[in-house]
């Protein structure tokens, strides 16, 4: 399909493989990767957490090389600095000990669960979460329960939001220790109390919830 589209639009097509990745080391805040494409890119620091960002960055580097082939001047330093400073609000975004992620569908919640289990395996975690009623599914409940020892639910600021108490009850039915908060501010305060000095707060769910939380935390949109 991609080959047909590229031929139709007279666009260059480049196929990449896992062999392109020479070295990769992921951590909770990003990754350091070395690639071999048309040139070698050594120790590229990625500011976006998540193993999938390694392949995304590989596509970026392939695009840079193609643009250079077409005559664009793009210094190596600009590429390294760009990847090291890239931000994506509410996508595995850290604010101190709070990890914010707009995981609002089964795939997103499973990816978040995998991330915290791989990168924060020995870290006590508290989940602060709010979802839309028409988005929540059974497998999401199971994965949310696996993310944290304690869960605080809130009602997102949206007409389609799932009531915090109803959400907490559903999580409890899946074995979680969950409680509902009357507001985002109350929920954040309770999550911080439960977290104490040693736990990470994972804040996940609807993008409406994540956006409101970012505003409450004073994070800039850029």
Where are these regions (language model features)?
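C-terminal helical cap/extension that packs against the catalytic core
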Residues: 1-14, 29-31, 98, 106, ...
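Short, active-site-adjacent cap segments at secondary-structure transitions
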Residues: 22, 209-211
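Active-site-proximal loop/hinge segments that shape catalytic or ion-binding/gating pockets
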Residues: 206
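Acidic, Mg2+-coordinating active-site environments of NTP-dependent enzymes
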Residues: 1-43, 61-77
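Beta-strand->loop->alpha-helix junctions that form or flank phosphate-binding loops
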Residues: 5-27, 46-51, 78-85, 103, ...
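Nucleotide phosphate-binding/pyrophosphate-handling subdomain across enzymes
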Residues: 38-150
């Amino acid at each position: 399909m991609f080959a047909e589209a590229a031929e139709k639009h007279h666009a260059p097509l480049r196929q990449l493989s896992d062999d392109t990745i020479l070295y990769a080391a992921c951590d909770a805040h990003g990754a350091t990767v070395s690639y071999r494409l048309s040139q070698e890119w050594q120790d590229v620091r990625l500011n976006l957490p998540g193993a999938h960002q390694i392949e995304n960055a590989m596509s970026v580097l392939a695009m840079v090389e193609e643009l250079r082939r077409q005559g664009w001047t793009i210094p190596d330093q600009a590429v390294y600095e760009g990847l090291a400073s890239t931000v994506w609000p509410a996508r595995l975004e850290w604010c101190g000990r709070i990890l914010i992620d707009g995981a609002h569908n089964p795939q997103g919640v499973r990816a978040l669960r995998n991330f915290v289990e791989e990168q924060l395996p020995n870290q006590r975690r508290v989940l602060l979460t709010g979802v839309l009623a028409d988005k929540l599914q059974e497998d999401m409940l199971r994965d949310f329960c696996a993310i944290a020892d304690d869960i605080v639910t809130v009602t997102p600021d949206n007409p389609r939001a799932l009531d915090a108490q109803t959400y907490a009850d559903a999580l409890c039915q899946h074995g979680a220790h969950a409680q509902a908060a009357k507001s985002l501010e109350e929920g954040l305060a309770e999550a911080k109390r439960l977290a104490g000095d040693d736990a990470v707060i994972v804040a996940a769910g609807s993008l409406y919830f994540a956006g409101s939380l970012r505003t409450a935390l004073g994070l800039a949109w850029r």
